[in-house]
C-alpha cells in the first residue's frame, strides 16, 4: 500500500454540519492538521466532531470554540488523529457561510 498525502478544502461552511472527510473502506487515515478560518466580519463559534463508526459514537474535539474575525483555529496541531474505516470528521459553525477549512491527511497507512 502506498501512503498518500492529501489536502481537503471546504469553503463557506455554515450552520449545517459538513463532513470534511470519511475514511475509505479498508484504509486508515492520519489527520495531520485541521485549520479553520473565519471569513466573516464578526466572531463565530465552531464545533468539530469525530464519528467513530466501529463504536457507533460521535464525540466533540471542540465545542463552541470562538474564532475572531480574520483569524483561524488550528484544531489539530502537533498531534495526530487516527481515522479508521468509515470514521468521519465534521465541522459546524454558528453562522451561515462563515468558515473555510483546510484538512491535511495521510491516507492508506
For the regions a protein language model found, what residue spans apply to each?
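C-terminal interaction-tip segments
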Residues: 1-33, 92-109
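Long beta-sheet-rich domains in secretory-pathway and surface-associated proteins
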Residues: 35-37
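Short, acidic/polar linear motifs in exposed loop/turn regions
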Residues: 39-40, 95
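Hydrophobic beta-strand residues in large extracellular and virion-surface proteins
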Residues: 46-48, 89-91
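Beta-strand signatures of extracellular beta-sandwich domains
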Residues: 47-51, 102-104
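Intrinsically disordered, low-complexity Pro/Gly/Ser/Thr-rich segments with frequent PxxP/GP/PP motifs
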Residues: 54-88
Amino acid at each position: 500500500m502506498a501512503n498518500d498525502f492529501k489536502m481537503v478544502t471546504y469553503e463557506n461552511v455554515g450552520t449545517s454540519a459538513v463532513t470534511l472527510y470519511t475514511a475509505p473502506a479498508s484504509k486508515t487515515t492520519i489527520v495531520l492538521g485541521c485549520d479553520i478560518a473565519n471569513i466573516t466580519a464578526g466572531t463565530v463559534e465552531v464545533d468539530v466532531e469525530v464519528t467513530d463508526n466501529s463504536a457507533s459514537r460521535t464525540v466533540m474535539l471542540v465545542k463552541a470554540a470562538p474564532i475572531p474575525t480574520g483569524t483561524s483555529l488550528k484544531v489539530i496541531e502537533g498531534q495526530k488523529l487516527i481515522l479508521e474505516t468509515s470514521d468521519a470528521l465534521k465541522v459546524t459553525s454558528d453562522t451561515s457561510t462563515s468558515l473555510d477549512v483546510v484538512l491535511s491527511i495521510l491516507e492508506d497507512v
